[in-house]
Amino acid sequence: MAEEHETRPPSAGRPPSSGRGRADDADEREEGEIADDDSGHAPPQANPAAPHPLEHAWTFWFDNPQGKSKQATWGSSIRPIHTFSTVEDFWSLYNNIHHPSKLVVGADFHCFKNKIEPKWEDPICANGGKWTFSCGRGKSDTMWLHTLLAMIGEQFDYGDEICGAVVSVRGKQERIAIWTKNAANEAAQISIGKQWKEFLDYKDSIGFIVHDDAKKMDKGLKNRYTV
């Protein structure tokens, strides 16, 4: 099993400071440009507090195992937590929620594009599938964060194919999966799987399972794609 690495993928990280020194401004001033404004008006300044919007809004969902029953329909206990659409909102939420290693066994924590529910029955998910990898208990925190950053930061070439991601905490392991829209689009699925492994520096093979195949609950279920 691959070990965790602390390097982050290119992603929607914390926003850089917009402040610049006067020496930098002078170096970048073109020849003949007037240095001082004699109009009496202060030059426009960038607002360092301005939010950094994401390309898509995303929603965190939580499936509480304590709210499940054996008779309940699958997915009936999933509840939306909060929707965010800026880098700042993401970090505010992420820094104030339990990370996978702190979740109870049986919990599922999702991050999906807004208005897409993390269910097979959702029309956008219905024809898709998921890439999945597993790791030991308590070892998924860093990989979950890197997955989120790569996803909301639009680092995937086929990002439009991605519905969202989920981390699932089980008795002996934790699983992270990326859900996609169209399982039949092999080029997109292979690209997403390969890039995901690169972002995580994950060396083991991962498999892609089609949702329609997973519904059959076949113990001999095989991966449609492997990278």
UniProtKB/Swiss-Prot annotation:
Transmembrane regions: none
Binding annotation for mRNA: 70-75, 102, 120-121, 170-175, 215-219
Domain of life: Eukaryota
Extent of Low complexity compositional bias: 9-20
Disulfide bond entries: C125-C163
Family matches, as InterPro entries: TIF_eIF4e-like, TIF_eIF_4E, TIF_eIF_4E_CS
Subcellular location: Nucleus; Cytoplasm
Gene Ontology CC annotations of this record: cytoplasm; eukaryotic translation initiation factor 4F complex; nucleus
MF GO annotations: RNA 7-methylguanosine cap binding; RNA binding; translation initiation factor activity
UniProt PTM: According to the redox status, the Cys-125-Cys-163 disulfide bridge may have a role in regulating protein function by affecting its ability to bind capped mRNA.
Region ranges (EIF4G-binding): 52-55, 62-98, 146-155
Region (Disordered): 1-52
GO BP field: defense response to virus; regulation of translation; translational initiation
Keywords of the record: Cytoplasm, Disulfide bond, Initiation factor, Nucleus, Protein biosynthesis, RNA-binding, Translation regulation
Pfam families the UniProt entry points to: IF4E (PF01652)
Compositionally biased spans, kind Acidic residues: 25-37
Assembly information from the UniProt record: EIF4F is a multi-subunit complex, the composition of which varies with external and internal environmental conditions. It is composed of at least EIF4A, EIF4E and EIF4G. EIF4E is also known to interact with other partners. In higher plants two isoforms of EIF4F have been identified, named isoform EIF4F and isoform EIF(iso)4F. Isoform EIF4F has subunits p220 and p26, whereas isoform EIF(iso)4F has subunits p82 and p28.
Family recorded in the similarity comment: Belongs to the eukaryotic initiation factor 4E family.
Record-given protein name: Eukaryotic translation initiation factor 4E-1
Name of encoding gene: eIF4E
